[in-house]
């Protein structure tokens, strides 16, 4: 076993060696390095063939038509293109958008920008289980609603929303539905032939592919129109200009091919590891699982260790790569906005750690990590006067602390 141990697979995944091999074949003079837009010679034709093969591989994982897959630089760009693209194209129909308070910042910052442009946005509060239900969406729908954006799998707590049911609702009301699925590819089965989802964002680097490449699914029937956010050359049917990065696209295609073939077995294995880890750390008192215990992916365990400061715990776990909150914003000392939206108090939100398991996690690593967590929590609680008071039977919620 090598240290440190990587347990932050929701932040990013290492590139699968099979993916890296395919990518290397598209970089040098001996390989498939051509510009896919070069129509006049074989180098361009071969590159275009590789790009279209990858487009088919991505489409197959989610049961879509390859023509519905648009290449982007990642899920952040896909979210921007979907939300701004719809808002700008359909603004004459209405200026109301619905999303949730626990979306990724790529969605929330995009809707904030649209608010500055005169759009109105409703931010749904999740239940204590971290889920957004169709009933919540239905209650927020208005005559002028043009778009609903509710994610599939939450990046911080791993909860899984029922996007099929939300899609049935939005389609029946003539409202477009966008889903951020960055965290669900390779973890949860997606069937876009059946689901009434209009737009879906994908990322390669959350699915053992390279960083810097993603895709947006844009439904053809019924047709969804977007206003391009990037201009210059008219690539990707005018929706996203820019020379296509053949090596990254081929990498994403291969990553999604592997995900399709190995998802079922991999999820079972990871569920076993996650359960093993959770059982061991649950021997500690005052450990809380954040988000639904059932509607979640097994890859993600977000736990709060009461009477322990999350940052101190991370510092104590020097051999473990884990996170508190989302990697994009984990430098902030504010408690996680996702956990606050669940109704967790500041103390529990501050004491949360996200453990995420993946393809290369082993049983030995999980056992070592659980042992280290139990040791660190025990030591930190020994230093905590609040822990002493709790052990003495003091109800800390009833104490009025003096402000200073």
From Swiss-Prot:
Binding-site list for pyridoxal 5'-phosphate: 75-76, 155, 183, 203-205, 243
Pfam families in the record: Aminotran_5
Biological process, per Gene Ontology: [2Fe-2S] cluster assembly
Main location: cytoplasm
UniProt key word Transferase: yes
Coiled-coil regions, chain positions: none
Pathway(s) the chain acts in: Cofactor biosynthesis; iron-sulfur cluster biosynthesis
SUPFAM superfamilies: PLP-dependent transferases
InterPro entries listed in its UniProt record: Aminotrans_V_dom, Aminotrans_V_PyrdxlP_BS, Cys_deSase_IscS, Cysteine_dSase, PyrdxlP-dep_Trfase, PyrdxlP-dep_Trfase_major, PyrdxlP-dep_Trfase_small
Annotated catalysed reactions: (sulfur carrier)-H + L-cysteine = (sulfur carrier)-SH + L-alanine
Subcellular location: Cytoplasm
Extent of the signal sequence: none
Required co-factors: pyridoxal 5'-phosphate
GO molecular function, one term: 2 iron, 2 sulfur cluster binding
Modified sites of kind N6-(pyridoxal phosphate)lysine: 206
Keywords, alphabetical: 2Fe-2S, Cytoplasm, Iron, Iron-sulfur, Metal-binding, Pyridoxal phosphate, Transferase
EC code(s) of this entry: 2.8.1.7
Job of this protein: Master enzyme that delivers sulfur to a number of partners involved in Fe-S cluster assembly, tRNA modification or cofactor biosynthesis. Catalyzes the removal of elemental sulfur atoms from cysteine to produce alanine. Functions as a sulfur delivery protein for Fe-S cluster synthesis onto IscU, an Fe-S scaffold assembly protein, as well as other S acceptor proteins.
Subunit structure: Homodimer. Forms a heterotetramer with IscU, interacts with other sulfur acceptors.
Family statement drawn from the similarity comment of this UniProt entry: Belongs to the class-V pyridoxal-phosphate-dependent aminotransferase family. NifS/IscS subfamily.
Entry protein name: Cysteine desulfurase IscS
Organism (species): Azotobacter vinelandii (strain DJ / ATCC BAA-1303)
Taxonomic classification: Bacteria, Pseudomonadati, Pseudomonadota, Gammaproteobacteria, Pseudomonadales
